[in-house]
């Protein structure tokens, strides 16, 4: 077919122009000014934020503000990856615990030029986060401006269920026991006395401080202090709430605790100020926020971590983008906007001029929040805090699952924290092997080009002959290159480098040291064994079930179209939705799996998500469910391509069904 008109005018220039238009017409905002904000706000907070952004857009019609919600880890890792590539949002909003890492990496910039000392005086000291410059440690930089202070935990009580206020931990336990109800005697509680996200280390901090423990040594340094008698006592108390008093559901994460309290199935919840607005406005019950009680055995108050939530500026922003972004920050931290957030969400303001408002004295929630904040401890804004959380989580969750004692968990936390912090601050310098690898990469590339020179020559010749064809497949090639080939090669290079918290931008090739360290890890072989088991089991069941179902559907089965649709659903549904569904089914208290086990099989319920072996088994079952439909579709397509004459000839020759399957199928 010739690309020409009847009059001989070639259409190729027109086609090229059309393709270029289609490729670049969706390139985004071509005009105006754009500010991108990544945040971690709850739905209630987002509603208030959008209202304030609309007001800002009305005042600045030439500026477009795009606010995107990100989960905690998604924001942290996504911002790091974007910053490494020289991109990312102009602004990020969140708690101050990530700032130590971001500043050490050198991916956020000093906000002092837009907040001079005269403006800084308008804020309470805790609202402004200053950290040493990554370039000159003798100089400090303003890396976050907070629009609120606190971000702390407190106790919220459902007053329709509980009229008392616990002042001590013994009183809290007594009330929780009284409010924990199993109405039908089936062993499953319809209501709990106390719920909170006790599987995460951040939410156990009030129990640590109430027993006199802390995560770092009291000398102000960065040495962890996780293995102390006080910490063991705190973990013991949490474990007793679960196992002895049974007032909290097993594996109670944030979503479970939040849902139970909102549905009136819990009398008390420990949660942060970001959630109180939802509870106080819940039409199903009357809620009240009160300070956490005093630990009876020590007389110390349960003090949560207190942190600032605020805005930070991306180092990769251009001067013009930075100026626009800081104009937005100045608006969102203004007294007018903070009053709106304070009134609707019960947050404590960061501007000094708002601390004398009658609302702070008259509103019981704000009074309780201020009192709770006084009892709390400031969150350390250091890069090592990330290592503390990551070191606490495995042993703490193993403790809750019953595989470790409190003393063992505390000891393992301390050892892992010391190791993680040492690795974090380790500086690996390139040696001769690293320099040789750097040059060998370029030599390999040059050798590949020389080796494939004839193929490249044929490609260039074919390009001149079939430019339009290559232009059609160019978008697919670009996508494959950017999403598969480049990330793979880039990660291979990074695995040979000293890229770390201390060498985030100035990393160099050091050789195979990272691989050697992995092989030296004691856990390496256990993880390798699990990987082999995972691969073998999934492969057997994916192929086995897939082939079996494909053979059945390929035969004379009535309603095969309906069966095919039903069996393809696990593969068609997004994996994220499937994971959430199975997670709910494996829940210890309310999951369908345990309901079948206990009520129909009369066997004890299994803590699927609380123990390593059971959790691994649950993951395998979920992945089998996800994977077999794909193999079924592939096999069914192959079966339908086999000529039926082969089976007819085999039957004439007297071949059995197994022989037909083995020799033909």
Predicted segments, located by residue:
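Long, aromatic- and glycine/proline-rich binding clefts that accommodate carbohydrate-like moieties
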Residues: 126-131, 342-394, 398
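A structural signal for multi-pass alpha-helical bundles of membrane permease subunits
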Residues: 468-665
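Glycine-centered hinge/linker elements that transmit conformational signals in sensory
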Residues: 175-178, 220-251
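Extracytoplasmic/periplasmic substrate-recognition and gating elements
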Residues: 137-140, 232, 240-249, 281-347, ...
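Extracytoplasmic/periplasmic solute-binding protein
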Residues: 138-153, 171-223, 266
């Amino acid at each position: 077919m010739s690309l020409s008109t009847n009059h001989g005018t070639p259409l190729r220039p027109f086609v090229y122009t059309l393709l270029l238009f289609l490729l670049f017409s969706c390139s985004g905002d071509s005009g105006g000014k754009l500010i991108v904000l990544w945040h971690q706000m709850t739905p209630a907070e987002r509603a208030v934020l959008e209202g304030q952004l609309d007001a800002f857009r009305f005042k600045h019609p030439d500026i477009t503000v795009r606010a995107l919600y990100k989960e905690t880890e998604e924001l942290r890792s996504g911002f790091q990856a974007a910053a490494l590539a020289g991109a990312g949002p102009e602004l990020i909003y969140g708690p101050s615990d990530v700032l130590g890492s971001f500043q050490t990496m050198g991916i956020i910039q000093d906000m002092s030029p837009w907040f001079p000392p005269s403006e800084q005086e308008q804020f309470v000291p805790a609202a402004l986060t200053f950290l040493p410059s990554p370039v000159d440690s003798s100089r400090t930089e303003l890396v976050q401006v907070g629009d609120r202070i606190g971000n702390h935990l407190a106790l919220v009580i459902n007053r329709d269920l509980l009229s008392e206020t616990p002042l001590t931990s013994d009183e809290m336990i007594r009330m929780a026991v009284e409010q924990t109800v199993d109405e039908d005697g089936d062993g499953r509680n319809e209501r709990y006395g106390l719920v909170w996200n006790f599987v995460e280390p951040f939410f156990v901090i009030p129990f640590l401080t109430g027993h006199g423990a802390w995560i770092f040594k009291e000398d102000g340094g960065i040495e962890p202090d996780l293995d102390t008698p006080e910490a063991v006592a705190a973990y013991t108390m949490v474990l007793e709430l679960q196992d002895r008093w049974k007032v909290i559901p097993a594996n109670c994460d944030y979503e479970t605790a939040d849902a139970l309290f909102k549905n009136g199935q819990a009398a008390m919840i420990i949660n942060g100020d970001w959630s109180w607005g939802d509870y106080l406005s819940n039409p199903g019950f009357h809620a009240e926020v009160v300070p956490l009680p005093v630990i009876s055995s020590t007389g110390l108050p349960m003090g949560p971590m207190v942190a600032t939530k605020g805005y930070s500026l991306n180092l990769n922003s251009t001067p013009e983008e930075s100026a626009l972004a800081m104009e937005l920050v100045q608006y969102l931290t203004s007294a007018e906007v903070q009053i709106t957030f304070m009134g609707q969400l019960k947050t404590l303001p960061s501007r000094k001029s708002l601390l004398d408002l009658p609302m702070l004295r008259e509103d019981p929630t704000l009074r309780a929040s201020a009192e709770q904040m006084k009892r709390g401890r400031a969150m350390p804004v250091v890069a090592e805090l990330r290592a503390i959380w990551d070191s606490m989580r495995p042993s703490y969750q193993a403790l809750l699952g019953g595989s470790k004692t409190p003393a063992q968990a505390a000891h393992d936390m301390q050892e892992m924290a010391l190791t993680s912090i040492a690795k974090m601050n380790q500086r690996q310098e390139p040696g001769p092997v690293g320099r040789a690898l750097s040059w060998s990469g370029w030599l390999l590339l040059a050798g590949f080009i020389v080796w494939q020179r004839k193929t490249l020559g044929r490609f260039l010749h074919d390009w001149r002959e079939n430019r339009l064809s290559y232009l059609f497949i160019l978008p697919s090639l670009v996508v494959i290159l950017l999403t598969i080939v480049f990330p793979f090669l880039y990660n291979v290079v990074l695995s040979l480098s000293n890229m770390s918290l201390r060498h985030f931008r100035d990393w160099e090739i050091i050789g195979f040291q990272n691989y050697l360290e992995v092989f030296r890890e004691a856990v390496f072989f256990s993880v390798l064994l699990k990987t082999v088991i995972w691969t073998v089991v999934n492969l057997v069941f994916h192929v086995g079930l897939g082939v079996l179902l494909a053979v059945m559907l390929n035969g004379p089965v009535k309603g095969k179209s309906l069966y095919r649709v039903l069996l393809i659903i696990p593969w068609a549904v997004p994996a994220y939705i499937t994971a959430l569904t199975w997670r709910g089914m494996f829940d210890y208290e309310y999951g369908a799996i345990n309901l079948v086990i206990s009520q129909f099989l009369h066997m004890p319920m299994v803590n699927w998500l609380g123990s390593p072996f059971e959790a691994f088994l649950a993951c395998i079952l979920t992945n089998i469910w996800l994977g077999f439909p794909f193999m079924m579709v592939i096999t069914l397509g192959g079966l339908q391509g086999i000529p039926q004459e082969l089976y007819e000839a085999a039957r004439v020759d007297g071949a059995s069904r197994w022989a037909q399957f083995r020799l033909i199928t």
